């Protein structure tokens, strides 16, 4: 069963979508975080939520400000509002399903970037949790320039940049400055599975490999032929299988994935 609602907390209005297991109270909660220009109805989120529903798991997804069904405007999109949205959703999930014994995170691209920026506060709330990062935008400033189709910073300072897919966002240089001064390349001391396409047109593969080396508890699975959106036949099924196995294993055996 899927349920929609909007969380209101201070200056935040956060559309959420919950996927409930059909026959169980659910002992596991999965927080799903979409990418830049995407939304909570992502095909990856939907497929993994459906699969994990067979394994006693509640999934909760949400829209960042200025994304999807969010009533917030592009001028309200910032790293601060994105991180606070994620943390608010986590607080809501923990209060809604107090019986949960385990927490997991699925985060794609920009969503992975925001998750890593907020990792310390997430640990404070959920303890050690299992995390799957799909095509993480570790240096989001570089990804943003590719999405904006410009490397002319001077031009960006003069005007606003239109980004997005189904919903367009008009963003100023101030947002890019936030991205420039915040990158997620650090040792986060967390077990994590990184799913990365080797033909990704947005992510610098050298950044991903360096991040894997820096994070000794991480595991990188490189998907041959996959682009950033993993939209070739069979790739979605592969992601679902790998994520499910990672979430369900009692102990994270990295050697099985390397």
Residue spans for each PLM region:
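Catalytic nucleophile-loop/oxyanion-hole region of alpha/beta-hydrolase
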Residues: 67-97
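N-terminal cap/lid segment of alpha/beta-hydrolase-fold proteins
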Residues: 1-25
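Glycine-rich nucleophile elbow surrounding the catalytic serine of serine-hydrolase chemistry
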Residues: 107-117
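The serine-hydrolase catalytic nucleophile loop
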Residues: 37-49, 206
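Conserved alpha/beta-hydrolase
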Residues: 45, 49-71
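Alpha/beta-hydrolase fold nucleophile elbow
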Residues: 97-109
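The alpha/beta-hydrolase serine catalytic core
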Residues: 104, 113, 125-214, 218-222, ...
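Short beta-strand element of the alpha/beta-hydrolase
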Residues: 26-35
């Amino acid at each position: 069963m899927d349920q929609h609602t909007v969380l209101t907390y201070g200056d935040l209005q956060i559309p959420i979508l919950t996927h409930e297991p059909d026959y169980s109270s659910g002992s596991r909660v999965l927080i799903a975080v979409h990418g830049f220009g995407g939304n909570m109805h992502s095909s990856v989120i939907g497929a993994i939520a459906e699969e994990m529903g067979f394994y006693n798991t509640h999934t909760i997804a949400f829209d960042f400000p200025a994304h999807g069904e969010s009533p917030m405007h592009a001028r309200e999109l910032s790293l601060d509002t994105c991180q606070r949205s994620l943390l608010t959703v986590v607080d809501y999930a923990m209060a809604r399903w107090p019986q949960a014994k385990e927490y997991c995170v699925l985060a794609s691209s920009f969503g992975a970037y925001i998750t890593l920026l907020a990792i310390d506060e997430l640990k404070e709330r959920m303890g050690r949790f299992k995390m799957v990062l799909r095509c993480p935008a570790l240096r989001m400033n570089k990804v943003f320039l590719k999405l904006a189709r410009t490397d002319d910073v001077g031009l960006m300072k003069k005007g606003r940049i239109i980004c997005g897919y189904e919903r367009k966002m008009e963003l100023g240089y101030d947002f890019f400055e936030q991205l420039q001064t915040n990158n997620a390349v650090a040792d986060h001391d967390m077990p994590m599975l990184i799913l990365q396409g080797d033909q990704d047109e947005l992510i610098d593969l050298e950044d991903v490999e360096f991040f894997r080396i820096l994070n000794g508890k991480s595991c990188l699975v490189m998907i041959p032929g996959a682009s950033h959106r993993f939209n070739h036949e069979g790739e979605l099924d592969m992601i679902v299988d790998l994520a499910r196995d990672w979430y369900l294993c009692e102990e994270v055996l990295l050697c099985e994935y390397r």
